[in-house]
Amino acid sequence: TRPARMLIDHEVITEPALSDIEIMEFQDAGRLEAFNTDGLRSLLSTMNHIPNLKEKTLRFPGHAALMLDYRNQGLFDESNIEKTSKKLFQEWKLDENEIEFTVLDIIIKGEMKIITYHLYDEFDLSSRTSSMARTTGYTATASINLILDNLFNSRGVFPPEIVGANINCMEFILEYLRQRNVIISEKTH
């Protein structure tokens, strides 16, 4: 588990992965813990005009402590990772009709208001598609359709935030997801 990079006051800082654990309550997902992980990647350079950016992973309470324990036991060391991975994949395998979910909150704190974008998606029984496949896979196929429909015709490799900065591209992707019942809500407080 690599260290978590984030922007604090326009500076890239590093914190240990699985640190800064907090409990969050969701109406649809229940009680989850959030902890630092290294998910910002390209956002650290493409969005460095934003003073503070932090990404946390959500899991059921106790997950971070378990992973820290595994790390401290050396189970994620190069010599043990294959055995550990095999064990974890077996333990985490879902039953055939077990409902899993994906939840994502993007919280934007301004001087005058806070805007939260919320996504909650579950396993689709009719198509037998996991929520993670739906939320990431449909976004990828929407991006391919952007190119096929000539809505995005720049050449090269672009991180998602550059594509999404084009309002037409962003609206196309959100509508593509909506048509597949992947809904992102917006709340201002």
Tell where the protein language model's regions lie, with residue ranges.
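C-terminal catalytic/substrate-binding lobe primarily of soluble NAD(P)-dependent oxidoreductases
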Residues: 1-189
